[in-house]
């Protein structure tokens, strides 16, 4: 086909589709290839099997990858937890995000160890610089978006009914806090519309 021009391509496409019964697909994929985080294969925070969900949906809608039936550039993405490693909520039309229903598990002794400086916050991820002494009020309590946490100097309290499951406290103190046991997923449909002037 090198060197052919558009009028010749139209004839070739017609012959392929009408005489040779070849499926050429659409002019572009309306359903983008689904994406998922590594999920339970590598992450302790994954609340469901992201890889399996992504595989099953890909197999169910495989034909839509090149025979457009979805709205323009429809995207499925699967995040195993609210950390959002594949940015499902921000970058897809159909987001499946792992979450939990029950309470955040608290190890009060580990919380005290963080406050005492025995454990590095953020699992030591920012250990290259001297950030000063860990301040649970400034680094965890005050940064909670729903203000559902309280530290009385010896015990951490979480109002789980108000918790929005953002993972900030868990990421900051992973030895002290952990996701609950009643795990599942939230499904969010719809995307931001493009800004058109």
Regions found by a protein language model. Name each.
Residues 1, 189-191:
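A structural signal for short, well-ordered beta-strand segments
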Residues 2-124, 134, 157-164:
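Small-residue-enriched alpha-helical segments and adjacent helix-cap loops
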Residues 26-29, 140-143, 191-193:
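A glycine-rich, aromatic-flanked flexible loop/lid motif
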Residues 89-94, 181, 188-189:
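Long insertion/accessory domains within large nucleic-acid-processing enzymes
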Residues 101, 149, 192-195:
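Short connector loops/turns at beta-strand edges and beta->alpha or beta->beta junctions
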Residues 107-138, 171-179, 195-197:
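Short Fe-S-cluster ligation motifs
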Residues 138-158, 164-186:
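Iron-sulfur cluster-binding cysteine motifs and their immediate structural context
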Residues 163-166, 192-196:
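Accessory, usually C-terminal, subdomains that scaffold auxiliary metal cofactors
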């Amino acid at each position: 086909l090198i060197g052919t021009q558009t009028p010749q391509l139209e004839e070739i496409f017609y012959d392929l589709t009408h005489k040779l019964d070849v499926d050429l697909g659409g002019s572009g994929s309306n359903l983008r290839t689904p994406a998922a985080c590594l999920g339970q294969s590598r992450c302790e925070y994954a609340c469901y099997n992201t890889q399996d969900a992504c595989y099953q949906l890909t197999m169910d809608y495989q034909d839509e990858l090149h025979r457009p039936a979805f709205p323009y550039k429809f995207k499925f993405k699967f995040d195993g937890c609210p950390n959002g490693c594949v940015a499902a909520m921000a970058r897809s039309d159909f987001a499946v995000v792992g979450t939990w229903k029950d309470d955040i598990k608290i190890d009060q002794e580990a919380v005290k160890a963080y406050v005492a400086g025995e454990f590095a916050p953020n699992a030591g991820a920012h250990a290259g610089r001297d950030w000063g002494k860990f301040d649970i009020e400034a680094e965890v309590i005050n940064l909670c978006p729903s203000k559902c946490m309280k530290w009385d100097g010896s015990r951490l309290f979480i109002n789980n009914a108000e918790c929005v499951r953002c993972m900030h406290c868990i990421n900051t103190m992973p030895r002290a806090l952990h996701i609950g046991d009643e795990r599942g997923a939230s499904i969010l449909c719809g995307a931001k519309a493009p800004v058109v002037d």
